[in-house]
Design a protein with these regions (language model features):
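Short, glycine-/polar-rich solvent-exposed loops and beta-turns at beta-strand/coil boundaries
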Residues: 26-27, 41-51, 72, 107-111
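Periplasmic-side early beta-strands and strand-to-turn transitions of outer-membrane beta-barrels
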Residues: 116, 123-125, 145-200
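Non-catalytic regulatory/gating segments with a bias toward low-complexity or hydrophobic composition
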Residues: 35, 95-96, 115-117
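Transmembrane beta-barrel architecture of outer-membrane proteins
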Residues: 30, 52, 82, 92, ...
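Short, acidic, small-residue-rich periplasmic hinge/interaction motif at the N-terminus
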Residues: 1-22, 62
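Short acidic/polar hinge/loop motifs at secondary-structure boundaries
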Residues: 54-56, 64, 72-99
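Outer-membrane beta-barrel pore domains and translocons
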Residues: 1, 100, 118, 131-137, ...
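Short sequence motifs at beta-strands and strand-loop junctions characteristic
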Residues: 49, 107, 135-138, 177-181, ...
Length: 200
């Protein structure tokens, strides 16, 4: 059978597009700030080298949290935190959060809960956004999004460059933030075959 968020008999929390746009201007590089503000969720950095972070729901280890992108698993178990660094807020329409066991629907990786990242889709009104952000922790984020729907075709294009320099504010020899460069380019094509049929 199908396994859609709409058919799950449990509470689903939403982070709306308005909130994503607001908080995304503060931290365009990832969605950790947004998730940290949700009750019962903690994002914990798991690697000083790559900057990967795990999502802990209700105190359980990050390997028990399942990350989905448009309803499909991104990474499972210990690698789930990689999805945080590959999904900047500018590319998202909303985020759905389920706390508690959904393992019967999504496997053993969803014992603590799941986070479903919903991508933007093109609309008839053209959307063009550009974000440039610098941080006191030696970080730089540049990202852009374009989306538009025509009669039978639509497209979205997301591109980003994230740069972080090693930052040691206490001069202890250990960096508070790792050094990395990240490039993202994510084009999508949508075909509207009929009024109720869409292919992407």
């Amino acid at each position: 059978g199908t396994r859609t968020i709409q058919n799950i008999p449990t509470r689903v929390e939403f982070i709306s597009r308005e909130e994503l746009d607001e908080k995304g201007s503060m931290k365009p590089g990832d969605i950790r700030m947004l998730l940290n503000e949700s009750t019962g969720i903690i994002t914990q950095q798991t690697s000083a080298t790559s900057g990967n972070a795990a999502i802990r729901i209700q105190g359980l280890d990050g390997r028990y949290t399942q990350i989905l992108k448009d309803g499909f698993p991104v990474f499972a178990g210990a690698a789930s935190g990689l999805g945080l660094l590959q999904t900047p807020p500018l590319d998202l329409k909303q985020v759905e959060i389920i706390k508690g066991s959904t393992s019967t629907l999504y496997g053993g990786g969803a014992i603590a809960g799941l986070v479903n990242l919903i991508s933007k889709t093109p609309e008839e009104k053209r959307e063009l956004s550009l974000h440039l952000n610098g941080t006191s922790g030696k970080g730089l984020d540049v990202s852009g999004f374009y989306g538009q729907k025509f009669e039978k075709v639509g497209t979205t294009i997301f591109a980003a460059y994230n740069r972080n320099w090693a930052y040691d504010p206490s001069n202890t020899g250990f960096t508070a933030n790792p050094q990395f460069d990240r490039y993202v380019f994510n084009p999508k094509l949508f075909l509207y075959l009929t009024e109720n049929t869409e292919m992407s």
